[in-house]
């Protein structure tokens, strides 16, 4: 390929990435983004006005003030009207932006806890997210279900290094710090699947520390949460039952599954693994093929993964273990085809 064409391809590549992951800070899907977006548009509008004014002034000076042989260019020193204008206009613009910013900061106030908020505890790990619904005790990882129209209050910390929790389509990012609790709240105005990302460099797989937020109507969320509370792992097929035995022998020391003796806390809770659309914290699609590859060689698929490889598992054991993990579904899980943006 001609190297001179590479710069021309950059916008196409970036555009393709945007279309795939639909991460957009200008999305008006939450009150936070709406307020901040309006402020950014106001600042952009003033920037355009100033730019147009500067271009006009430069052209005016070039055309009207150019020097001819023997001419004395017109002088503007002592022009009180011009000097007052050059001081008053920037002062007015800066003042408007200042007070608009103060008003926006007061409106969003996303660190305080609303009275009717759903409280979710968030813990960042290298390289995945742990979520606990505080009132119900339901625990999940990497993919979070929330109700629309109701504030969700996040109490966040980290188990190892500093991470940063950010779902751009819903609002502001906040660091998760070991030994500290940081807080914020967000509200999704409409149903959808919103993509998030760790935005604090945290190790080799920082870019692979992703998450998804599934926003559904309140009634649908309540039904899902009730089903998640009542969930007990009960594999039906013979393959899934054999896979449960493999899981207990190979995985239970690090992972937990609700309603079983597996209560590990080192890795993600896998109680609802069959519901998740991805594995590896948003990196790979949740299909049997990728699941078996992940189990066989997690560090090879995600650099820095603390999950050991299991090359000694037979193909039959991998198939059974995958069948068991895919069977772990709660009742009333939202149909993502209906809520996907």
Language model regions located:
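Extracytoplasmic entry segments of secretory-pathway proteins
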Residues: 2-148, 341
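Extracytoplasmic electron-transfer domains, predominantly the class I c-type cytochrome c fold
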Residues: 229-238, 245-248, 261-328
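Conserved hydrophobic/aromatic pocket- or pore-lining residues that grip, position, or stack substrates
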Residues: 90, 122, 154-156, 198, ...
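Electrostatic cytochrome c docking/interface patches
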Residues: 115, 137-140, 219-248, 332-341
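Beta-strand-rich interaction surfaces with strong enrichment in secreted/lumenal proteins
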Residues: 142-144, 171-175, 185
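Solvent-exposed coil/turn segments that connect beta secondary-structure elements
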Residues: 125-127, 149-151, 157-161, 170-172, ...
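Extracytoplasmic
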Residues: 115-117, 139-141, 147-151, 160-162, ...
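Extracellular/periplasmic metallocenter environments
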Residues: 96, 176-229, 235-237, 249-252, ...
